[in-house]
């Protein structure tokens, strides 16, 4: 299961959805990136659905999205890989 997480302007809590296939979540990620670049002239709405919770729908304005990330949820006891970025300083 893959999670796609959105950070919104003026919101301390991220929104997330889960998809079963990486190709599905990557396609949505690319669509959101494109919409974020096009929001200078207009304010597009983006509707997202979740595979884990079938009735979950989220609609957001593209111009309010600050960041988007993908991470894989693991089914092992550890739960999920930690979202975010790692910085290796040698």
UniProtKB/Swiss-Prot annotation:
State the family it belongs to: Belongs to the UPF0367 family.
Q: What is this protein called?
A: UPF0367 protein P9301_01411
The organism's taxonomy opens as: Bacteria, Bacillati, Cyanobacteriota, Cyanophyceae, Synechococcales
